[in-house]
Amino acid sequence: MSDHAMNEQRDHDTRLRAWRTGIDTYQEPIVYMRSDCVVCRSEGFTTQTRVLLTAGTRSAVATLNVVEGNWLAPGVAGLSEAAWHALDPAADAWINVSYAPTLDSLSHVRAKVYGHRLDAGAFNAVIGDVAAGRYSDLYLAAFVTACAGDRLDLSETVALTRAMVAVGHRLDWGRETVVDKHCVGGLPGNRTTLLVVPIVAACGLTMPKTSSRAITSPAGTADTMEVLAPVNLDIAAMRRTVERTGGCIVWGGSVRLSPADDVLIRVERPLDLDSEGQLVASVLSKKAAAGSTHVLIDLPVGPTAKVRSTEAAQSLGRRLVEVGRAIGLQVTLRITDGLQPVGRGVGPALEARDVLAVLRGQADAPDDLRQRALRLAGDILELGGAAPNGSGLQLAAEVLADGRAWAKFQAICEAQGGLREVPVTPYRQVITAAVAGRVAAIDNRVLARAAKLAGAPKAPAAGVDVHARIGDPVQAGQPLFTLHAQTAGELDYAGHFVDTRPPIFQISEEA
Amino acid sequence: MSDHAMNEQRDHDTRLRAWRTGIDTYQEPIVYMRSDCVVCRSEGFTTQTRVLLTAGTRSAVATLNVVEGNWLAPGVAGLSEAAWHALDPAADAWINVSYAPTLDSLSHVRAKVYGHRLDAGAFNAVIGDVAAGRYSDLYLAAFVTACAGDRLDLSETVALTRAMVAVGHRLDWGRETVVDKHCVGGLPGNRTTLLVVPIVAACGLTMPKTSSRAITSPAGTADTMEVLAPVNLDIAAMRRTVERTGGCIVWGGSVRLSPADDVLIRVERPLDLDSEGQLVASVLSKKAAAGSTHVLIDLPVGPTAKVRSTEAAQSLGRRLVEVGRAIGLQVTLRITDGLQPVGRGVGPALEARDVLAVLRGQADAPDDLRQRALRLAGDILELGGAAPNGSGLQLAAEVLADGRAWAKFQAICEAQGGLREVPVTPYRQVITAAVAGRVAAIDNRVLARAAKLAGAPKAPAAGVDVHARIGDPVQAGQPLFTLHAQTAGELDYAGHFVDTRPPIFQISEEA
């Protein structure tokens, strides 16, 4: 055989037809190949081999699962959903399969596991490979675990943050001051962003806000905003919105400001490890990438919130301020009350309804949501120089009261693609107080779980509507909260969950 | 609907028919279910949900992968090979799918991640869940990472070792002295076990040796032995072999002496992390479970061996002796030279060939392998009381020289199922010296990598045959080593790897 013919032969030995299996492996790209396929046999691939898949100009590293079975046709490479989306091949396109390049950055992960400090070069190498999708879930888990707790010192956290900024897009708004906010951890119903952005933008500041969808909660800010307007904007559409209105509230995932963070989250979610360094790097890298200069961090503290003590909040807050300074962000903190849900609704549409009530100045609008939003907006107005120190809150209240914030919110929604009607659910179940007394505590985590079982955030109108707050007196039989669901089955499922748990609302019987 | 009918309805909602997908996910049980199946819909399962699968009296915890696609029939639960073997269902058997029970022991893993000490109760809880298959690969990775390096102190290592012994079988040989040996870490070609066991057994000691397959190396002792005789013996067959011959060399995994170790290894292999505590617990738990009383630990030291300095060997050795004492094992150490490969072959069949040459007293047998085996056998003969102190080496040499060891080895192979022929490969490539000089150093790790890329240990005949040793003079063009492969693709791949690396053999040009 000539050299040319041999090379051609060799190329053919490493090609298979792309086939979409529809298997959702969460985000890890997996390729399914028959053990008797020409590629496995000629290359000596076995299960767990890390392989490089190439389709046209796109490539992705995937983990191989070898298959013995006829459901996978001969000559095809079955792709998991993550692999399919990474390659985006035409139907029946050729996929070239080869060994994944050696991952030299794993030596840094090992060094960190063994307790050594990593320098900026090491973090750049690791995060570069992570963002490029070269780490398997196991490698990601080792890296996340090795950095968990307080294992990253200040300079390591700075280096990690810079590395995460470096691999993403970085927006430039051509303005001296660009404000932003972030709320750490879950507090059901805490949708202040949808109020803060229009208030602040109405005062002339620039606030291009990217928000996340729910990861483990019944609604993320992006999910709630999506009830009212499109949020899947690309960077060009986001830019048009901000240039026209001074603000936006879009989904961060579609602008991919921090691609490394998008990857790390896939193991952080199931592992559920607290990691101060990674939290700081995740938050601040996205703010820096969004082109922000001044960032307000809202830290709700409570026994069932993410941050459980004021000391923990202060320690985390210090780290956020220090790392922010190192990467050129001015960070300010507000430690807030995280004892109970904010507003009444928990779930995208129910929360959107609360937001609209506040913006429209309705008499029945939840006052806690309004007060929280005004305090945060006031802080940002002062931070961004739109109000003298001490008068931000007053300015924010004026702008909300006189309808400028509501007008600005409508303008933002229009610019993002049009204001939408809030949907409602057909199936509801009211949960009432078993005894008379006073509401002593509310378990935020279990309440959030009930809202998810009722269908939130997949069914945007589903969730929980809360009717009583801590300290409220209640009569036996008085409604405490209402489950909202899109289907009878989901209502049943959430209702059964609530019935079989200790009460979500603790009622202390009065003497 | 009556309560009874409703309960029946609910039971039916959680059942699917078992279907074997043939997908090899290495060892993690995965269940594939259609997103529109009744179970996903009624239970709210999503991808990555940890579910409990029950088929008849057997159950297993698996990770769910949701599928959109018609290759998976409606109403079936597709099982990965690991899930299929764990449940062993009849064809079309009903599988009940429910949420996996809460894993309380994860709180201990998190505590360890955050740097806290774990007590015996914590290790028992974690290892109990690990051995029962309740940990996903991500949880295993977090645990292994959190215990890596020197993160386990002495009492934690003792507790981990005891916990690992407690979940496995523990053999009882009814004899006062049962000897064993273990070699720490990789030294390519170091197959002294296949020589030590027959020598020691020929002198009347009992040595029921369980060995591992390759984890990250081109051959484990069990892989090499399997070239010569079956090693997948169950405990009854192992017992028959030892009762008949005084020794055996079997695969530890098939007798499941340390089921927790068998599970941990599935993430340790790809992560490739060093962990003193886990190494000690892994080694000693298997020795204790095998019913050993006296254990010789061979610690090869060299710049590219697993243990790189005499100090590191002594520190690890102390830990092995201390933990051994705590669990009732008498542990003795021999620190050996780990500068270069032992024998000539690297890979199961090539190593087996070297072993046979030594046993048969062939003139071309590798002397380094022979000398190493004699020293270790001599130590064990003294440790087990079969030779007075100082005369073990001489006795070992006599038994090897007069053919008693070879006869014993053949008896052991026969008892294990029959002595086999050693296979050879069709594809070979000779790597030669680029310059004349003297061999100054050999990179064991890169050499092992080349042997693996050539196909070892999956292709037992594949690997590397080494033709020169440190200190040998070589001419330019003289063969240094030969790659052996079962397929042209693998030979090509290994050859390309060798060509594009710095030379594996360092040749210092003579003045």
UniProtKB/Swiss-Prot annotation, chains A, B:
GO terms for molecular function: 1,4-alpha-oligoglucan phosphorylase activity; thymidine phosphorylase activity. Keywords: Glycosyltransferase, Transferase. GO terms for biological process: pyrimidine nucleobase metabolic process; pyrimidine nucleoside metabolic process. SMART domains: PYNP_C. Pfam families: Glycos_trans_3N, Glycos_transf_3, PYNP_C. It is an enzyme of class 2 (transferase). HAMAP family: Thymid_phosp_2. Belongs to the thymidine/pyrimidine-nucleoside phosphorylase family. Type 2 subfamily. This is Putative thymidine phosphorylase 1.
